[in-house]
């Protein structure tokens, strides 16, 4: 996985896809700040995810953004997406690799270096840690810190993705402490004060 320091945003989809979503996504991608886009839809059927995924994949391809699927290796394979993100309750990376081959596989490690070491043994391509702040998207069960990033950097040179309540007021400290990508969702899609494009433009 290549790391582009100027494209440090790992954008996660809203849970509900509104009509305005696709035009908002294009505007965001035009800023050239996004390296990854993860499709995360919990309450849609496989068929619905497939239809939505095909549209998003085209947009991602046009802007050279890697298209990842949350949790579902079979949807990843069907869409021929660039990769899949796996949680701790999902299939492990080695088993996922048997299904989707040499695609990008990222693994949630919460705040645990022990889980990170296991993910590395299972050949994960990147490690995701969090939550670093309170989140509008998920209830915070695990609290990560800057020290989590520092410890992770000592055991691997794989990219580190940080997640959890990241916004324009708190993102810089994470980058200064060598997080490679900022996973953002609620700040963009649930922001009551700004449109998605204005929110992304606050992150320089």
Where does each model-flagged region fall?
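N-terminal amphipathic alpha-helix/helix-capping segment at the start of soluble metabolic enzymes
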Residues: 1-24
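Hydrophobic faces of well-ordered beta-strands that scaffold small-molecule active sites
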Residues: 7-13, 37-39, 67-69, 84-86, ...
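Glycine-rich phosphate-binding active-site loops on the catalytic face of alpha/beta enzymes
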Residues: 11, 86-96, 128-140, 171-204
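Catalytic domains of carbohydrate-active enzymes, especially glycoside hydrolases
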Residues: 25-40, 122
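Catalytic cores of alpha/beta
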Residues: 28, 67-82, 96, 111-124, ...
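N-terminal active-site wall of soluble small-molecule enzyme domains
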Residues: 36-99
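Alpha-helix-loop-beta-strand connector modules within alpha/beta enzyme cores
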Residues: 50-69, 95-112, 140-168, 201-204
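Glycine/Thr-rich beta-alpha phosphate-binding loop at enzyme active sites
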Residues: 78-88, 107-156, 191-199
């Amino acid at each position: 996985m290549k790391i582009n320091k100027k494209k440090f945003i790992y954008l996660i989809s809203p849970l509900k896809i509104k009509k305005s979503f696709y035009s908002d996504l294009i505007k965001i991608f035009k800023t050239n700040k996004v390296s990854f886009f993860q499709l995360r839809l919990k309450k849609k059927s496989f068929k619905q995810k497939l239809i939505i995924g095909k549209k998003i994949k085209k947009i991602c391809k046009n802007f050279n953004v890697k298209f990842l699927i949350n949790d579902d290796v079979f949807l990843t394979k069907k869409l021929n997406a660039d990769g899949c993100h796996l949680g701790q309750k999902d299939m492990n990376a080695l088993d996922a690799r048997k299904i989707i081959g040499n695609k990008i596989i990222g693994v949630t490690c919460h705040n645990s270096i022990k889980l990170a070491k296991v993910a590395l043994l299972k050949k994960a391509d990147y490690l995701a840690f969090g939550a670093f702040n309170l989140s509008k998207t998920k209830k915070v069960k695990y609290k990560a810190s800057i020290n989590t990033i520092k410890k992770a950097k000592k055991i691997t040179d794989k990219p580190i993705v940080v997640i959890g309540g990241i916004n324009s007021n708190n993102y810089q400290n994470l980058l200064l402490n060598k997080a490679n990508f900022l996973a953002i969702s609620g700040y963009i899609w649930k922001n009551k004060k700004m449109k998605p494009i204005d929110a992304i433009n606050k992150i320089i």
